Amino acid sequence: MKIIRTLFLLLIAVYGSSVVAKPMLKATFSSTTMYYGIGPNSDKSIVAEVTIATPEGVYYGSWNLSGHRKGETLTADSWSGPEPAPKVVLKDFDNTVSRSACKNLPSNWRGCGSFTLEITVQSDDYGCPWLASSHIVATTFITNETYSPPDTRSSVCPKVPVDTFDISWDANVSKQKTTLMLDATGGTVNRTLHTYLMEGGKLCDGSKFDNRGAYCRFVSSGITLNVLGCDQSSVTTSAVDHPITDVELHDINVAVNTRNIGSGQFTSTCSFQYIIDEL
């Protein structure tokens, strides 16, 4: 199940003069397929990054996939959580995958590939939800360009319904439309807004390490943001992800070129689409 939410930003510019380790239980995901980009020349490094989110902590690890054979167990390059680190075994690979499998792959990259991994993580014994999220970061030679597709999410916990979750411009109330007032300076004016995850009309705060916070992190790890653009070419927007342990979901950066606004009032509407994916 997927829930789609849309946020609207009305922009108005007016001309003016101014860890504690606990016993762990094993959980194995025997066939996790992750995609990676094949760079313009070749890839200097191909690294699998895994995030384990539990009710009491969020841990990060990385494993280098380059130069390994099928059946090999990969050694963790880094792991921030309690030992042992997740065990990662290379089961298969394919460098002839359709480009469509690599979402938003740069046009100058040659193609898309995949690795199939067996990932054994340490599930906590103090209850659900916990979640393993993983993706591959490919880095090219010469330019050091990087590409990473969306996360692959895995869990053995019961499904978390997402129909009561929403996205808001305001941390205090569910708000899908907002207005940003700007003074035109004759140059480019920059502003940053934030978005928040709401549940039942209240802030869902992933920075809280309690039962509600654990579910907030679980759901926010499956959220995709599409920046749909603005109806005026002089306005541009971009989004920056926050970690799932932050209060905010995204920073929405707004840049307005006020050079040709002149006197009077200028308005523009920008749209952002959120997809909340159920796991």
Swiss-Prot record:
Swiss-Prot/TrEMBL keywords: Signal
InterPro entries with a match to the protein in the record: DUF2544
Signal sequence residues: 1-21
Record family assignment: To E.coli YfcO.
Protein name listed in UniProt: Uncharacterized protein YadU
Annotated organism of origin: Salmonella typhimurium (strain LT2 / SGSC1412 / ATCC 700720)
Gene that encodes it: yadU
